[in-house]
Amino acid sequence: TAETHLDPTLLISADEWKKIAVSKIDKPYILIFTANPAVSLVDFALKLSKEKNLPVYCINDAPHPVSHGINYIVAPTVEEFVGCFKNAEYVVTNSFHGTAFSVIFNKNLFVEFKNKSGRNIRSEGLLKSLGIDREIVDGNCNETEINWDIINAQLKTLGSKSKKYLSEIVNME
């Protein structure tokens, strides 16, 4: 069987990521970040916005707004991108890195695994390995409890294993 290891994004601690994070938003919000544009995620985020009474921000590389009721963060710098996740109250995503940064910063996250281009197996695998059940299915997701103390301990263990593996590969003759 193939051995799996953490994505390098997850090998850097939240404290290290926080050092570069820059945020221009100073109030609680819901963040949308998509690898593939998805109306279903926008709809889910807008529904969550009504429930939680929070504004929605969407990281987007397009210069024009796409949906009414959403604030767009267009082409953020790396520091702003990281800051968007660090300061979000909730994250709605179908992206592996959206999932990873949500986990790094211990965010209330909701992830859509299935989309038009297939299944996001990297996000699915990461969340299942950590025992997080926050999949959006047919526009719905239960806000199950996430015990971040347990998950952070698991991440630390998995990170040590991954770093050891990388060190062994780099030091091979």
Question: Which residue stretches match the model-derived regions?
Answer:
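Active-site anion-handling motifs in enzyme catalytic cores
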Residues: 1-173
